[in-house]
């Protein structure tokens, strides 16, 4: 029996919309990352982007458990000496709610060009509205 290898031009990609309201951040992000990679499909091939497009709505209503809202810290660097910046989860969810889900999912995707291609298929919106109605996304319950 010959091993099946998916071809990038023959992969069928669907659009799904996920409501993040009341969902736990890590559990939601791991399922989204798995869908972006295409691991739920029978034709999954590790070196080919076989994943679907995922639209996340209500990103501002995602939750974390325990004390993580005050304790979880996100770091970035300005590339200048002494330029490390930090912000906690509860401040970031108010300022840029999309970034919380994007960073969680991005950390679960592979590094390199293939991971960046998978990450580009993620669309995150703070509110309940999105502008991908033309793609006719299906509702995905996670």
UniProtKB/Swiss-Prot annotation:
Cross-referenced SUPFAM superfamilies, in alphabetical order? Ribosomal protein L13
InterPro entries in the record: Ribosomal_uL13, Ribosomal_uL13_bac-type, Ribosomal_uL13_CS, Ribosomal_uL13_sf
What GO cellular component term, any one, is given? cytosolic large ribosomal subunit
One Gene Ontology MF term: structural constituent of ribosome
The record's subunit annotation is: Part of the 50S ribosomal subunit.
What HAMAP family does the database record attribute to this sequence? Ribosomal_uL13 (MF_01366)
UniProt lists the family membership as follows: Belongs to the universal ribosomal protein uL13 family.
Name this polypeptide is given: Large ribosomal subunit protein uL13
* Encoding gene, per UniProt annotation: rplM
């Amino acid at each position: 029996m010959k091993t099946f290898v998916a071809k990038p031009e023959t992969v069928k990609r669907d659009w799904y919309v996920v409501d993040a309201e009341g969902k736990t951040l890590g559990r939601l992000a791991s399922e989204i990352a798995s869908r972006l990679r295409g691991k739920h499909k029978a034709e999954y091939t590790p070196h080919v982007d076989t994943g679907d497009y995922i639209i996340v709505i209500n990103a501002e209503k995602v939750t974390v458990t325990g004390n993580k809202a005050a304790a979880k810290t996100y770091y970035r660097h300005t590339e200048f000496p002494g330029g490390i910046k930090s912000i906690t989860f509860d401040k970031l969810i108010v300022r840029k709610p999309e970034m919380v889900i994007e960073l969680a999912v991005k950390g679960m995707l592979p590094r390199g060009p293939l991971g960046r291609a998978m990450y580009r298929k993620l669309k995150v919106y703070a509110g309940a509205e999105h502008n991908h109605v033309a793609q006719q996304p299906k509702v995905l319950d996670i």
